[in-house]
């Protein structure tokens, strides 16, 4: 089940209930490319300052790369306080640091095997 919090006071966009866990999920969309890699900001603004997401605020950042029609399901612990992450385009021969998380909906899987995505 996916729920949306009421108001804009939380650092996440959705709660995903997989029957065992409640995951706080922040959704980001990107299409900006620099030096052959898609660049995506994974930070929030507070008091006029941009800061990275932390484990106390969100559990996953789900990134949609629009030109490739590709989703990445990123555990926030994998972001290691980064404010920006880079993704290789589909078909690229470059090593993609976050390639394991491409379409990794299984990370949100519940005990009944239900997978979101």
Can you annotate each of these PLM segments?
Residues 1-10, 15-117:
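Mixed-charge (Asp/Glu-Lys/Arg
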